[in-house]
Design a protein with these regions (language model features):
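Aromatic/hydrophobic pocket-lining residues that form the small-molecule binding cavity
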Residues: 1, 23, 27, 67
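Active-site-proximal beta-alpha loop/turn segments in soluble metabolic enzymes
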Residues: 12-20, 50-56
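Active-site glycine- and acidic-residue-rich loops that bind
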Residues: 16-31, 89-97
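Auxiliary Fe-S-binding modules of radical SAM enzymes
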Residues: 35-154
Length: 154
């Protein structure tokens, strides 16, 4: 890890929150490690089961509340870190690109959104999460407007 930082590369580390069997102590340890590593980016998402994976049988979704709390804690502990706002909302059909969930994450302290540029035909074949939804820059512009944030991109 030190070599990565010394080379000038940015270091990212994040969490999948509330996967089956995960404890609050483990989440706390992860947060402290992220601070110790002085990361520049923290992708934090709730657990979403995906079909045909070992944890699929355990089903369920990770807690949005726990995920939003982790985002808020990270923002307080590391004001300069970039935190993603890719959060599901109440409708699982929207996957990680949900307006309600994204806005809650931005309000909790997240400051980054992804533009998923994967073509729809490929997205259906790439099943890291079920119901993957690809939304581009229009979604990001909408989210920034709803959150009262200014977009900075090149």
């Amino acid at each position: 890890m030190e070599w990565i930082k010394q080379s000038g590369m940015l270091l990212a580390s994040g969490n999948i929150v509330d996967y089956p069997g995960q404890t609050l102590d483990e989440l706390a340890e992860d947060i402290l490690l992220m601070k110790e590593l002085e990361i520049s980016w923290a992708p934090v998402i709730p657990y979403l089961s995906a079909a045909n994976t070992p944890l699929a049988a355990e089903g369920g979704r990770g807690s949005q509340e726990k995920t939003l709390r982790e985002i808020a804690i990270l923002r307080l502990m590391m004001p300069e870190v970039n935190i993603t706002a890719q959060q599901p909302g109440e409708n699982p059909e929207n996957g990680l690109a949900d307006t309600e969930g994204n806005l809650k994450a931005l309000n909790a302290g997240a400051n980054m959104l992804f533009a998923d540029m994967l073509p729809d035909a490929l997205a259906k074949s790439f099943s890291v999460v079920d119901n993957r939804t690809t939304l581009g820059l229009d979604h990001i512009k909408k989210m920034a407007d709803l959150a009262g944030m200014q977009l900075l991109y090149k």
